[in-house]
């Protein structure tokens, strides 16, 4: 049905992508939205993008787990725990393997997420061009098709999202 497919404009954007599209989700264990990318929830998270994968089956998706100072903490800790102690506590509470998490130093060596306030964020990469796809502090939290397609269009054309109306 029409509800289960992408709009014609989104299909055009995906159709113009003849190279590899990679989406990396950076999950900060100490961010309030860390739960979105937890391993137990990855399949549910991937459903957000299943319509895109249908049109771009070679789309690569990766999850990178780390801990660092968040803009909005996952919880307010009483006491004076260090960031590492907070991370270890969250790993224990959520039954997560500590080996899967990069330290603040390790994540910073890989990518600078300070401009994203160390929040859960997705990075779309296409033909060497990268753009971020964010989650939101509203009732919906997750990006809609329009926002996902705008980010893809930005990766494809390296233009502002305002130009998306000019999809050819």
Residue ranges and their predicted role:
Residues 1-168:
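Short, surface-exposed patches at the edges or C-terminal ends of soluble domains, predominantly
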């Amino acid at each position: 049905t029409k509800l289960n497919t992408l709009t014609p404009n989104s299909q055009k954007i995906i159709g113009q992508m003849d190279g590899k599209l990679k989406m990396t989700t950076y999950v900060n264990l100490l961010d309030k939205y860390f739960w979105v990318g937890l391993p137990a929830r990855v399949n549910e998270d991937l459903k957000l993008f299943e319509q895109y994968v249908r049109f771009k089956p070679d789309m690569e998706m990766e999850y990178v787990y780390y801990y660092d100072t968040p803009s909005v903490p996952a919880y307010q800790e009483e006491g004076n725990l260090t960031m590492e102690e907070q991370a270890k506590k969250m790993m224990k509470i959520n039954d997560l393997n500590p080996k899967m998490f990069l330290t603040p130093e390790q994540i910073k060596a890989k990518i600078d997420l300070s401009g994203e306030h160390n929040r859960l964020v997705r990075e779309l990469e296409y033909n060497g061009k990268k753009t971020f796809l964010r989650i939101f502090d509203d009732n919906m939290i997750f990006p809609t098709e329009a926002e996902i397609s705008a980010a893809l269009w930005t990766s494809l054309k390296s233009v502002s999202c305002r130009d998306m109306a000019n999809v050819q």
